[in-house]
């Protein structure tokens, strides 16, 4: 069994395009945009995992990014950006946490990372 990295890449590209378009149109709030960006990042990471025949045993973005760093030349700065994304997730916490407000600066950083990861992933597609 393996991951069909081409399908994962294609889905990531669709989410990426949607995130960029929604940001330009201003049709959704930052929290919704954040989730679409995370879906895109998840798909790009899954595509990279498939390229190196790796099936993640955990679905967390940070876990997958860290494992990719062991299996390929994966930029350390991407791991930091994935951690930044995860910093806004509160739904897995056992304690009640007030959701963090996602600012325009945060969204710009997330979109920049998403585009960098997209380009990185596409450059490795054979």
Residue ranges of predicted features:
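Terminal alpha-helical segments
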Residues: 1-126
């Amino acid at each position: 069994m393996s991951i069909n990295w081409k399908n994962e890449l294609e889905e990531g590209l669709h989410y990426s395009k949607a995130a960029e378009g929604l940001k330009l149109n201003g049709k959704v709030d930052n929290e919704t945009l954040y989730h679409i960006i995370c879906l895109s990042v998840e798909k790009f990471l899954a595509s990279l995992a498939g390229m190196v025949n790796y099936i993640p045993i955990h679905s967390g973005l940070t876990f997958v990014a860290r494992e990719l760093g062991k299996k390929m030349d994966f930029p350390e700065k991407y791991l930091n950006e994935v951690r930044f994304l995860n910093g806004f997730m509160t739904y897995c916490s056992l304690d009640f946490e007030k959701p963090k407000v996602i600012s325009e600066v945060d969204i710009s950083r997330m979109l920049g990372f998403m585009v960098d990861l997209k380009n990185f992933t596409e450059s490795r597609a054979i």
